[in-house]
Amino acid sequence: MIKHFRHAIEETLPWLSSIGADPTGGMTRLLYSPEWLETQQQFKKRMAESGLETRFDDVGNLYGRLCGTQFPEQVILSGSHIDTVVNGGNLDGQFGALAAWLALDWLKATYGAPLRAVEVVSMAEEEGSRFPYVFWGSKNIFGLANPEEVRHIQDAKGTGFVDAMQACGFTLPAAPLAARTDIRAFVELHIEQGCVLESNGQSIGVVNAIVGQRRYTVTLNGESNHAGTTPMGYRRDTVHAFSRICSQSIEKAKQHGDPLVLTFGKVEPQPNTVNVVPGKTTFTIDCRHTDAAVLREFTEQLENDMRAICDEMDISIDIDLWMDEAPVPMNAELVAALTRLCETEQLNYRIMHSGAGHDAQIFAPRVPTCMIFVPSINGISHNPAERTNINDLAEGVKTLALMLHQLAWQK
């Protein structure tokens, strides 16, 4: 079984990865780009050739369906997103969609038609890399995406969302799509994008929850002034204020310990020149934890600490909390079933949380959902160096196939 999946991956992953490949060795496949469209069309063709019924929905989510014999109205769904970050790797997202197809193809050849329908989904978008909107694919599956929220947004080059969509043959719906009600379960295979599995010599992660996230944009306003003639005690230096906030907050996060993580990812001082005291600094904060109460308590204290530092330094502060996503638990029964499967197959696995967001977090509050992780070499992702050992990839597809067999071929 592992040998079969290893061969299948070696044959199909380079093919799928060639569409949108960067000269640097990475991949760029943004929503409604020519590369995105070619990928979805080619994947649709390959799934159809393998005997699946294929279709696009109104926004470009791609499905490949194997009909069920006894419960055709019940769907077991598996897959992931097909888009990438700019100059990303070739496993994040697309391997989950590819793996679902490879698993289903093997199951069909081995066991014939399932009792319940099984669908592979290659979701249109998850990353938010081209337009300022995330989970466009999975949100539309459940009627959660409001077309008015994207109607007037543009990418960095000034191309409108609607125009890009139309260029690929799709039309923005006038209203949210009808939510699917036929999905009995969703299983997503994904690379870990971290170093836990590899560091512990384990090949499979059974995900029990996806962390909650709070993201901020913070703006500090002080006073720009001459770098040579303004004494240190008279400055309203926003970079100095930022450095204090950053250092103090990170130390508190370290003291708090896992699974809390805190990142200051983007810093923009103004006027950003060598001989002027920076009078304005804008920065972002990303904080994550598996417990909603802990996440809220830590970030509220962080907000108070920032205000206290700015008050002391005579600097005004504007705090914009623009993302507040609660932690999302996976379905307990599916997690237990997946755990039993790993035990039966004597897999080297661990139960763990996901520190990154995934399409599964959109599914989980609405349908029974579980996730399978495979290791990321050196924990690297969103990078051309994103890699996973071929045997671990094959182990992941095998685990997915066995899970789908339980859900769709057994009563």
Regions found by a protein language model. Name each.
Residues I2-S33, A124, H382:
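N-terminal capping segment at the start of a domain
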Residues S78, G88-E127, R214-L220, H226-K252, ...:
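Alpha-helical metal-binding/catalytic segments enriched in His/Glu/Asp
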Residues R29-Y32, T263-N272, T284-T290, S316-V335:
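A short beta-alpha structural unit
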Residues I9, W15, D22, G79-S80, ...:
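Zn-dependent metallopeptidase/amidohydrolase metal-coordination segment
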Residues E38, I210, H226, T230-H256, ...:
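His/Asp/Glu-rich mid-to-C-terminal helical/loop segments that flank catalytic regions of hydrolases
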Residues A21-C67:
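A non-catalytic alpha/beta surface segment that caps or lines the substrate-entry region
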Residues K44-A48, E53, L62-A164, E395:
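Active-site metal-coordination/substrate-binding segment of hydrolases
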Residues E125-E126, R130-A292:
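Midchain, well-structured core segments that form catalytic/ion-binding scaffolds
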